Amino acid sequence: MAKVRTAIGECRDCAGLIFDLRGNPGGVGGIASGIAGLLSSSEGSLGTMKMRSTQLKFAFFPQPESFKGPVVIIIDGSSASTSEVFAGGMQEIGRAKIIGETSMGAALPSIFQKLPTGALFQFAIADFKTPKGILVEGRGVIPDLEVRWNRKALLSGHDSQLDAAIKLLQTDK
């Protein structure tokens, strides 16, 4: 989190920020809230995780050094879990535009249980909904602008998804 805070601080005067979450399998949910606080001028929530007997909001609070400019997040079919919490929440609160391809749709927190055979069994322990109450599991985060991965362009040195994100920042001033 310290590296992200430093990077955003160094970009305070930038025209915009791009978060490339393609291929990001997720991580610690609280990090999504921490980053959202560095990009927001008011408090809010990226969504809610509901467990059997309780629920947890992915609340964020504005930080003094928060970035005020436009934000674009690039996702793809391999973006999952916490990256979906971050992208979907930022999209729904209107703080970021999402570009790329629909994410994996695997946003449920889970745990592993070791079986007597030594194998591991993974199972979901909660459900996640975006700020507007949309289930991401099995659906994914749907981009505002769908830009498909283009192998031919990539081989010639052009990343069509990144190019689209840059173009959006240049027109969103």
Model-flagged regions — what are they?
Residues 1-116, 154, 168-172:
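Cleft-lining beta-strand/loop regions that shape enzyme active-site pockets
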Residues 139-151:
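Short helix/strand-capping connector loops at secondary-structure junctions
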Residues 136:
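Alpha/beta-hydrolase-fold serine-hydrolase catalytic core, especially in secreted/extracellular enzymes
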Residues 149-173:
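Low-complexity, Gly/Ser/Thr/Pro-rich intrinsically disordered linker/tail segments
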Residues 117, 122-127:
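Short acidic, Pro/Gly- and aromatic-enriched capping/linker segments at domain boundaries
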Residues 130:
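Short, acidic, Ser/Thr-enriched surface-loop or helix-capping motifs
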